């Protein structure tokens, strides 16, 4: 897995660094872009940072300049760089980094070695054929021609064997140079080898019998073909630097022509006159220029594609590593809020943005319909709903006794720190006891065992968890000098588990058994675990168990109605004589778990900095004598080493490792960060409870390195880039993909098509897509720019060959044939048109008209491009053959020169590497067969003349009469020898062309495949990051996530935050468990909550944060994002937005009821504002929550409110009334800790009647609703409140609270007065004076006052 530097490279940052072509640090420019904080904006995923702008071409984008006299701006067009990270030395294409260049040469070495071996095979095969040719025809002594060729064949065998040694891998460049010089020497030596008489043959036809001393063994066509082959091998397979190859090639051409002219065969090829000598030299020079132009082009493009492919494959490997990290990041992020089995289902839909997924959920499959027997079926499509019923699940609720008193004199930051510390211990213990943490509600902590994955020992897990929590809080009190205790309740039964809503979702459980478990905690005793009879049935006698005696302790009044005769028990600990499971005790006593052979050197999440230390491991081995083994679960524990303790103090094994990591002196220490933000290790990926906070800190820390040190980047840029390149090299060296990629390409070895048919179709349409998308040209490897270079080379070769052909007529003082002129004119028009279209397609595609753009897109298709390419690549050959006339048969210079030009026309088919090699090689074969046909076919219509052009070889007369041929027979060369030599020449040349075309197409396809793989990985990573962002926004607010990147914890005080609690008050009447345990009822509730969540996606409500859902209660707040508050026109503008949101929730419920056939839900809303504290609690499962009296009062405004109306406090009334809202004064209610409070109701009654009595009565407590919710307030326990009515209407009803649910039938279509006018909505009053109230934090002694039970339980 990736190391921390790799993490730094994975997460892009907003610092841009660029330099000039020289890479001088003095010219480095640093640009820091501001972070985009909008949750809806996603930065475009950039390529791996190895692709920097520090290249030889500088800024390829160009500088805008004004065109003409108008105001139109056009970018200045510049040539792109050779390849990404190319050096400024164009004459030696290399990377600008030594590390990258060495890695590229190392990774490309299999391809280099393979091509060099192919070159040895070709050279050896050519030597063998020429040896056979000379030996058969006895054109020279064997010792002169055959022996050197055979000796060189043995040398090639030696070179081939040398390629299998390690010495060749280190010195393959010197080996190529040595072979090149040997080939040069051998081929140049053949230039001055003359024909020598051979005894033993008396026939007059023997060529050597009457040979002159100046007659050479090879014709000019044969020797020129050998020159072409040598030069092409030099430029394509010898792998020497470009400047060295070019110098050697030019030197070889000069020596070749020098030797060839000096040892010219005067008998067959008389020297031209003095006037025509300069035309001869110019023509030969142009032919050699064509060879070098084609060779340099092939060399450069081969290097460009090779290095581009290396970068693409390297980026693909890096993106593969990124993909692993992003996948682990996303998995651990979602596992931090829900179990793995539930997360896997949710991950399937996480590939969409939250707002898009909401729309998709609204139109989901119609199969998800209401299935409750008492509800009539209706054609309503539900959102995806993941909830399942599980039996035999143990539920644990734990409450901190004395928390109100402890928090009375604590600041917000201190309180959040204490809760984070304490709940961190519980999270660690929950993980070790195999329980699944559900959530925290204020100071309440609850978890389950046997859900969502069944466990046979679920009851033992919860009991051990409860006992461990009691011990953990005892240690907490000793360390923090506090006086708090734990009250734990456990019950076993059936639950519904799943997720409700579309935003700020979390895994939760619901059922009546859940409520009963909550009741067990409320009726329990501090310091003991209160269990039900259902849980006791799953336990043996290992625990000290006593009767619960609930009635004796609390009385008969309400308990009998609550428990309904259920027997309860209290567990104080394990029996001393049979303590079977001691996991919690061992963890709390400073022991740590030993997992098999791997010794954990600290709590999970500390990374590998200490676990890999040999001294730490040795210290741990010394403690094996003190090992402890749990008799129940078999877990082995060892004493924790003192090195892991902080400052030598005894460490708590269940305590989170960074409870004190934020020191005033040092701040957060990366080494002691949570495990999720440390470099992800393989053994940590299976952990289902890890910290999201660590993920955010890791991303922020590594992404912020360059931001924090941006001022030093100009001086350290080179060092940073070297380290980056070194890390890039280290990563790709560990991956086998690079070697397999070059040595085993994913293509068919015969057809060269991709093995994947879909990839092959994509490859054939890639060029057209480049044109359609108008993709920018960045490097020479770009398909459109590569085509431009091919067309330019084709035009150059065509003009050069045409010029040399016309020069021969100038030298011979013969007018050129009309056919050649016509072909030249038409071909030149095609070449110029193709060149103009290519330039237009590369640089000015955005300026063409629509019709021209469609034409260019059609031309870029696979078949049209091949047809046009076949024409362009054949134009040089067509131009050469257009000069073949009857003069070709009489003047020896014409067939020799035409044959030489035809050789260049054949090798020109190595151009246009984007086209099929089969097509180009086949066309080259057809063109190569042309000279062979011309040698044996006469073009002269008179049969009495020479029968074929081969007869012209036997005529050395300077006469141009085609019907006069008198050559002494003893000086004539046999025509068959020239024909056989030409056949051998073209066969070897075509063999080289077929080989090079195949290699170059493979190289081009590899480059495309590397690009596709890199883009595919980038797309996957971007999708992963989008999913992670989507999940992140649904776990905690975006601005909180940004803060957690740089801070260990998050807590913030807000002076004026708005809070609402909205409850579906009659959901208990709708809820039934007689069908699928009430699952379909919660499906309906999920739809309603989803509609509420959909409101939050509107821009008008962007300042509102959903906090949580508690059963059928929806909690939201505003004013928590200080950045948005500063942008607002008034500090209290968010309160108006929150109130409008509450009104919109009322409308949503009315619309929802219109689709219900028999039941109408009723919404009750409580509103309050004031100072509050927002923070993130937890270490393995984070929870964003808010605390304070403001939250408590808002909860009371809901629980004491009125159906279908919004109840607000007096402080909120003063603010909202000045915004134009009209309220009814209700009276006063008793709020715990606040006494009597005046409240107001919205909307105001329109008939000026007083409020009915049934609206003044107290609604059932949210904590004990029968809707299956756990119903606990986010802070302290909710008291049983009795309001004090200020005034009562004469006609008020006298209904009591027992009949409230039946009498409360408010009309859902109550006429509401619109209180806010357009001109008044933006007007706000001055600061609101608040009443001074004494804060009381003393808990009520009698726990019964917290129970408000309805008869329906």
From Swiss-Prot:
GO terms for biological process: adenylate cyclase-activating adrenergic receptor signaling pathway; adenylate cyclase-activating G protein-coupled receptor signaling pathway; cAMP biosynthetic process; in utero embryonic development; intracellular signal transduction; signal transduction. The keyword Metal-binding applies. It catalyses: ATP = 3',5'-cyclic AMP + diphosphate. Residues 49-66 have a biased composition (Low complexity). Residues 1-117, 163-171, 236-241, 302-786, 840-867, 913-920, 997-1353 are cytoplasmic. Residues 359-374 have a biased composition (Basic residues). GO terms for molecular function: adenylate cyclase activity; ATP binding; metal ion binding. Keywords: ATP-binding, cAMP biosynthesis, Cell membrane, Glycoprotein, Lyase, Magnesium, Manganese, Membrane, Metal-binding, Nucleotide-binding, Phosphoprotein, Repeat, Transmembrane, Transmembrane helix. Residues 1-27, 49-71, 349-375, 642-684, 1292-1326 are annotated as: Disordered. Glycans are attached at residues 206, 955, 964. Belongs to the adenylyl cyclase class-4/guanylyl cyclase family. PANTHER family: ADENYLATE CYCLASE TYPE 1, ADENYLATE CYCLASE TYPE 9. This is Adenylate cyclase type 9. It comes from Homo sapiens.
């Amino acid at each position: 897995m990736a190391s921390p530097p790799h993490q730094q490279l994975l997460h892009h940052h907003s610092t841009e660094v660029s330099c000039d072509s020289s890479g001088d640090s003095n010219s480095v420019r640093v640009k820091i872009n501001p972070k985009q904080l909008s949750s809806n904006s996603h930065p475009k995923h950039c390529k791996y940072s190895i692709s920097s702008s520090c290249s030889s071409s500088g800024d390829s984008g160009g500088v805008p300049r004004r065109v003409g006299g108008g105001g139109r701006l056009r970018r200045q067009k510049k040539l792109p760089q050779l390849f990404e990270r190319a050096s400024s030395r164009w004459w030696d294409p290399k990377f600008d980094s030594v590390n990258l260049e060495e890695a590229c040469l190392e990774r490309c070495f299999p391809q280099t070695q393979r091509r060099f071996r192919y070159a040895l095979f070709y050279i050896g095969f050519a030597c063998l054929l020429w040896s056979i040719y000379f030996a058969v025809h006895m054109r020279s002594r064997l010792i002169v021609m055959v022996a050197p060729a055979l000796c060189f064949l043995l040398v090639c065998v030696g070179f081939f064997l040398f390629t299998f040694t390690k010495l060749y891998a280190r010195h393959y460049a010197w080996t190529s140079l040595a072979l090149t010089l040997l080939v040069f020497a051998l081929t140049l030596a053949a230039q001055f080898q003359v024909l020598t008489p051979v005894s033993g043959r008396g026939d007059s036809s023997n060529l050597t019998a009457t040979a002159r001393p100046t007659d050479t063994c090879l014709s000019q066509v044969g020797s020129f073909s050998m020159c072409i082959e040598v030069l092409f091998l030099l430029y394509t397979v010898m792998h020497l630097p470009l400047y060295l190859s070019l110098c050697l090639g030019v030197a070889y051409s000069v020596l070749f022509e020098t030797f060839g002219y000096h040892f010219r065969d005067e008998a067959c090829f008389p020297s031209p006159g003095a006037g025509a000598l300069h035309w001869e030299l110019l023509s030969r020079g142009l032919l050699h220029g064509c060879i070098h132009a084609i060779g340099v082009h092939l060399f450069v493009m081969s290097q460009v594609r090779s290095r581009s492919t290396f970068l693409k494959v390297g980026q693909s490997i890096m993106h593969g590593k990124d993909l692993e990290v992003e996948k682990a990041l996303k998995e651990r992020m979602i596992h931090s809020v829900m179990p793995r089995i539930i997360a896997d289902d949710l991950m399937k839909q996480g590939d969409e943005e939250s707002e898009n997924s909401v729309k998709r959920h609204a139109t989901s499959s119609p199969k998800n319909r209401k299935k409750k027997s008492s509800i009539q079926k209706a054609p309503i499509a539900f959102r995806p709903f993941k909830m399942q019923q599980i039996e035999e699940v143990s539920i644990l609720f734990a409450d901190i006794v004395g928390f109100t008193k402890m928090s009375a004199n604590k600041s917000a930051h201190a309180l959040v720190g204490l809760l984070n510390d304490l709940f961190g211990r519980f999270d660690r213990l929950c993980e070790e006891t195999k329980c699944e943490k559900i959530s925290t509600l204020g100071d309440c902590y609850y978890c389950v065992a046997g859900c969502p994955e069944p466990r046979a020992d679920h009851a033992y897990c919860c009991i051990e968890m409860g006992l461990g929590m009691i011990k953990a809080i005892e240690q907490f009190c000793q360390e923090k000098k506090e006086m708090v205790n734990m009250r734990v309740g456990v019950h076993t039964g059936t639950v519904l588990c799943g997720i409700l809503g579309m935003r700020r979702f979390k895994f939760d459980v619901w059922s009546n058994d859940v409520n009963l478990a909550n009741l067990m905690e409320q009726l329990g005793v501090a310091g003991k675990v209160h269990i039900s009879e259902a849980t006791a049935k799953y336990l043996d006698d290992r625990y000290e168990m006593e009767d619960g005696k609930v009635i004796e302790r609390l009385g008969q009044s309400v308990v009998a109605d609550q428990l309904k005769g259920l027997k309860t028990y209290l567990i104080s600990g394990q029996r001393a004589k049979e303590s079977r499971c001691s996991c919690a005790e061992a963890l709390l006593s400073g022991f740590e778990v030993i997992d098999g052979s791997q010794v954990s050197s600290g709590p999970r999440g500390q990374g590998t900095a200490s676990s890999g230390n040999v001294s730490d491991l040795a210290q741990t081995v010394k403690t094996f004598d003190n090992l402890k083994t749990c008799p129940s679960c078999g877990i082995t524990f060892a004493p924790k080493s003192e090195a892991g303790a902080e400052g030598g103090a005894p460490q708590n094994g269940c305590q989170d490792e960074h409870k004190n990591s934020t020191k005033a002196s040092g701040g957060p220490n990366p080494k002691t960060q949570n495990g999720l933000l440390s470099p992800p290790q393989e053994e940590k990926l299976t952990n289902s409870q890890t910290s999201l906070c660590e993920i955010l800190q890791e991303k922020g820390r590594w992404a912020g390195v360059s931001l924090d040190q941006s001022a030093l980047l100009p001086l350290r840029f080179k060092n940073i880039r070297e380290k980056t390149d070194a890390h890039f090299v280290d990563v790709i060296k560990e991956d086998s993909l690079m070697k397999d990629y070059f040595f085993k390409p994913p293509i068919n070895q015969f057809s060269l098509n991709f093995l994947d048919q879909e990839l092959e179709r994509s490859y054939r349409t890639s060029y057209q897509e480049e044109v359609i998308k108008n993709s920018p040209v960045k490097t020479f490897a770009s398909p459109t720019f590569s085509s431009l270079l091919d067309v330019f080379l084709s035009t150059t070769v065509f003009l050069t060959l045409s010029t040399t052909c016309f020069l021969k007529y100038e030298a011979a003082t013969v007018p050129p044939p009309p056919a050649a002129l016509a072909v030249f004119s038409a071909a030149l028009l095609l070449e110029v048109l193709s060149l103009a279209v290519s330039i237009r397609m590369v640089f000015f595609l955005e300026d063409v008209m629509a019709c021209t753009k469609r034409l260019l897109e059609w031309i870029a298709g696979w078949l049209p491009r091949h047809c046009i390419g076949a024409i362009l690549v054949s134009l040089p050959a067509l131009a050469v053959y257009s000069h073949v006339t009857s003069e070709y048969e009489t003047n020896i210079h014409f067939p020799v020169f035409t044959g030489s030009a035809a050789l260049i026309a054949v090798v020109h088919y190595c151009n246009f590497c984007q086209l099929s090699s089969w097509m180009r090689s086949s066309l080259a074969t057809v063109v190569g067969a042309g000279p062979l046909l011309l040698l044996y076919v006469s073009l002269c219509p008179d049969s009495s003349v020479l029968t074929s052009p081969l007869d012209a070889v036997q005529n050395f007369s300077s006469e141009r009469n085609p019907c006069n041929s008198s050559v002494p027979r003893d000086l004539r060369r046999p025509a068959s020898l020239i024909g056989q030599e030409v056949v051998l020449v073209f066969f070897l040349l075509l063999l080289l062309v077929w080989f090079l075309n195949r290699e170059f197409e493979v190289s081009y396809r590899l480059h495309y495949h590397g690009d596709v793989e890199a883009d595919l990985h980038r797309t996957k990573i971007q999708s992963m990051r989008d999913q992670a962002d989507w999940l992140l926004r649904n776990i905690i607010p975006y601005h909180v996530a940004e803060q957690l990147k740089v801070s260990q914890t998050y807590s913030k005080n807000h002076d004026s935050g708005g809070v609402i609690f909205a409850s579906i008050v009659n959901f208990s009447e709708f809820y039934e468990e007689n069908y699928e345990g009430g699952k379909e009822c919660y499906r309906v509730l999920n739809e309603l909550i989803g509609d509420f969540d959909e409101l939050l996606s509107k821009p008008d409500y962007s300042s509102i944060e959903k906090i949580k859902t508690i059963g059928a209660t929806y909690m939201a707040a505003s004013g928590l994002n200080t950045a948005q508050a500063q942008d607002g026109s008034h500090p209290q503008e968010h309160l108006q937005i929150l109130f409008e949101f509450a009104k919109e929730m009322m409308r949503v419920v009315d619309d929802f009821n219109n689709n219900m056939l028999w039941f109408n839900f009723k919404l009750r809303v409580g509103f309050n504002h004031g100072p509050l504290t927002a923070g993130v609690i937890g270490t393995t499962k984070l929870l964003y929550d808010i605390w304070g009296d403001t939250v408590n009062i808002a909860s009371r405004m809901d629980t004491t409110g009125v159906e279908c109306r919004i109840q607000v406090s007096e402080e909120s009334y003063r603010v909202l009334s000045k915004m134009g809202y009209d309220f009814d004064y209700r009276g006063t209610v008793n709020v715990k800790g606040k006494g009597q409070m005046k409240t107001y109701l919205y909307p105001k009654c329109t008939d000026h009647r007083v409020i009915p009595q049934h609206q003044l009565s107290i609604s059932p407590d949210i904590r004990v609703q029968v809707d299956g919710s756990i119903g606990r307030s986010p802070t302290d326990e909710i008291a049983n409140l009795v309001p004090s009515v200020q005034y009562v209407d004469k006609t008020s009803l006298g209904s009591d609270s027992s009949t409230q649910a039946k009498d409360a039938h408010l009309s859902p279509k109550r006429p509401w007065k619109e209180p806010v006018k357009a001109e008044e909505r933006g007007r706000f009053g001055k600061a609101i004076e608040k009443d001074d109230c004494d804060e009381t934090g003393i808990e009520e002694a009698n726990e019964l006052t917290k129970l408000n039970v309805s008869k329906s339980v």
